[in-house]
Amino acid sequence: MKNIQDAYGQQLLAQYNRQTATAEIIERDDWFIDFGSDAGSYFTEYEQWSPLEQQTIKRARGRILDIGCGAGRHALYLQQKGFDVTGIDNSPGAIKVSKSRGLKKALVRPLSDIDKFKPNSFDTILMLGNNFGLFGDAENAGLILEKMSRITTTGAQIIAGTRNPYKTDDRDHLEYHQFNKKCGRMPGQIRMRIRFRKTVGEWFDYLFVSPEEMRDILTATDWQIEEFIEQPEEANYFTVISKKSEGNSTADEHR
């Protein structure tokens, strides 16, 4: 990714360098446009996180890979707790910020290249900040989950956050669900790009799923739901996904 296309990274750099950083603009492929997250939210400390997020991150253990680490808020918290943490992001700007903030291991690396890590490198994979969405679609999720299986230890876990797309009464979003179905996509699959000031990112897919859809995605993989961490009234939720034991793995049957 060229720096000029790294709208997300430019936003983080502006915030880190104390410039006036507004929220990024999210543009969807149905021409829906909205403000995304305020830049400051990517720099929040543990005390500012939601109770559910605080509860979830306590499940992290061992050697940790933080996927989509951004400005490093999760990775830095765990590093300060004494964990061996590696952060990756496909945004050069994000990695520059996370390194500047003190993250010792931070790499510009897309999710598709996680198999460049050696086998048995990690005990926990983090996909917080709704980053289960980085799978993009169900088919790609299966491919990436297989790579995750190879780079993690026996008994490893994925700790992820996402959003239930069906917990909305917004007409624009409900119409987009139907638009997606007509395009042969999952209702919560968003094709989007990010704008910040004069910088425009590339189009990419981001996936929101219900708990039931997440279970379906994991069915033919080496992974299974261990626990959902959620509140009934909230659309955002977290999950702990555990690696199946060798005798309980179903992925080999589908390769």
Tell where the protein language model's regions lie, with residue ranges.
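A short glycine-rich, Lys/Arg-flanked "PGG" loop and its adjoining helix->strand segment in the class I
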Residues: A141-T154
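A short acidic, Gly/Pro-enriched loop at the edge of an enzyme's catalytic core
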Residues: K116-I125
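SAM-dependent methyltransferase
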Residues: K2, Q11-Y16, T153-E213
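S-adenosyl-L-methionine
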Residues: M1-R59
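Conserved class I S-adenosyl-L-methionine
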Residues: R61-G70
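Conserved SAM-binding strand-loop segment of SAM-dependent methyltransferases
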Residues: G102-I114
